[in-house]
Amino acid sequence: FSLEGGESLIPAIDFLINSAAEKGIEEFVMGMSHIGRLNTLVNIFGKSSRDIFGEFEGKDYEEDIFDGDVKYHLGWTSERISTSGKKINMNLAPNPSHLESVDPIVQGIARAKLENDFDNNTNKVLPIIVHGDAAIAGQGVVYEVIQMSRLKGYSTGAVSYTHLRAHETTSD
């Protein structure tokens, strides 16, 4: 599930994070499916290739307690420094194989951070959701979450939605 054909996602997210940090955002909560996820973990979240391959080899998790979903759907939390030197907290939410079920999770994590850590200051947390082609169908969880985000109890102030078109190559 490479990012082939959509490589511009990495510099786009990097630009978004650095620009938002300049405006005062301190926490980013991101949700995405499998396409480009490993690339994003390494290049945006700073997860080492060694950690990723360790998960694939099954050395980091006891099989009894692991939920059985694919390992590249696990979440990750990290801290990074923006291009201007600001500390940024980063969270990539775990994503189950039902691709867009992560959307309300991301919104909920962001809302909880706003309420518990930032006194509801919506200028401190930015949710980022990356969708694949199949998610933009005009109905379903994506649009439900967008509609809920307009309700007082669910609003996070803003959400960055990105549509990533899946490019698959085949040979004859």
Where are these regions (language model features)?
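Glycine- and acidic
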Residues: 1-4, 26-27, 85-99, 123-132, ...
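N-terminal amphipathic, basic-rich helices that act as targeting or association modules
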Residues: 1-43, 50-51
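Phosphate/oxyanion-binding active-site loops and adjacent basic polyanion-contact surfaces
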Residues: 2-13, 94-106, 138
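Secondary-structure transition/capping motifs at alpha-helix termini
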Residues: 18-27, 47-55, 81-85, 112-123, ...
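Acidic, glycine-rich active-site loops and adjacent beta-strand->loop/helix elements
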Residues: 32-36, 131-136, 164-165
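Short acidic, glycine/serine/threonine-rich loops at helix termini
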Residues: 38-45, 136-143, 150
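Active-site cores of enzymes that catalyze phosphoryl transfer or operate on phosphate-rich substrates
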Residues: 53-107, 111-115
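Single conserved hydrophobic/aromatic residue that forms the stacking wall/gate
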Residues: 163-172
